[in-house]
């Protein structure tokens, strides 16, 4: 109703009702930002370059997707509460994630373990201050996700010569492998459970692929067919928010709070 009201106030009754029926919003981003809908802007989608030469010898694709503004709102709320969600959501400027499962995970038990999964997440922001704050927020929450979390200061020092000017890197060791968090300008890149050398190669490839101009892609087609997708009822498919949080839950993210996020994503608005 708030979306309809905003369009009505800006463009009149016809635009709010008949107009939105003729050109309905295509994403929650447009509903959250009715002015962007009115201007016919499209949401930013970071570019995912060809990572296959780096990962195919060790991993098979497990999941891939965008991290939209509503997804970010829920993640920020899980990580830092209402204040974090309120502060970070307007500064969001796109995001994507990719997860792979180790080819060495052969048995059902090995494949069911989160130790078989590695994940990277690219988060784009409208300003450098928000990017830096989100990187710190993410780092602060790692202790709730992993046991045995320790800063790897030696690895951080060894990376200093390879970082571009202005970039900052945090490295941690965990019970499920290294975590590398890099902030470069308005971008935050997180790699979890990849070996450090591979994480840094992925970081360089993906961050270098991002342009400085406005991105014009509205969506990307899924390149991975998930188990059971052929049998799924399209009418019963959950929104991206619920799917992303369920996926992150399966990977171990925010084990203490993720059920609350799932409940919030699926509850009536």
Language-model segments: which ranges?
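Soluble, non-membrane globular domain cores that form compact, hydrophobic packing
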Residues: 1-119, 124-269
């Amino acid at each position: 109703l708030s979306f309809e009201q905003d369009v009505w106030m800006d463009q009149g009754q016809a635009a709010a009702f008949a107009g939105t029926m003729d050109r309905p919003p295509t994403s929650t981003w447009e509903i959250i930002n009715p002015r962007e809908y009115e201007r016919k802007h499209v949401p930013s989608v970071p570019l995912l370059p060809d990572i296959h030469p780096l990962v195919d010898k060790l991993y098979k694709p497990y999941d891939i997707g965008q991290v939209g503004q509503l997804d970010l709102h829920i993640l920020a709320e899980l990580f830092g509460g209402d204040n974090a969600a309120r502060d970070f959501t307007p500064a969001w400027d796109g995001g994507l994630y990719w997860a792979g499962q180790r080819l060495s995970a052969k048995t059902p038990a090995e494949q069911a373990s989160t130790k078989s999964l590695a994940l990277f997440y690219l988060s784009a922001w409208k300003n450098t201050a928000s990017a830096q704050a989100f990187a710190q927020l993410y780092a602060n929450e790692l202790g709730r996700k992993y046991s045995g979390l320790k800063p790897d200061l030696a690895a951080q020092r060894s990376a200093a010569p390879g970082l571009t000017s202005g970039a900052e890197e945090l490295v941690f060791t965990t019970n499920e492998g290294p975590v590398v968090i890099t902030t470069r300008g308005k971008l935050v890149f997180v790699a979890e459970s990849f070996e450090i050398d591979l994480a840094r190669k992925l970081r360089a490839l993906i961050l270098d692929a991002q342009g400085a101009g406005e991105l014009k892609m509205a969506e990307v087609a899924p390149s991975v067919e998930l188990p059971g997708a052929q049998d799924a009822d399209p009418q019963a498919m959950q929104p991206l928010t619920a799917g992303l949080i369920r996926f992150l839950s399966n990977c171990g993210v925010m084990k203490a709070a993720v059920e609350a996020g799932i409940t919030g994503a699926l509850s009536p608005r």
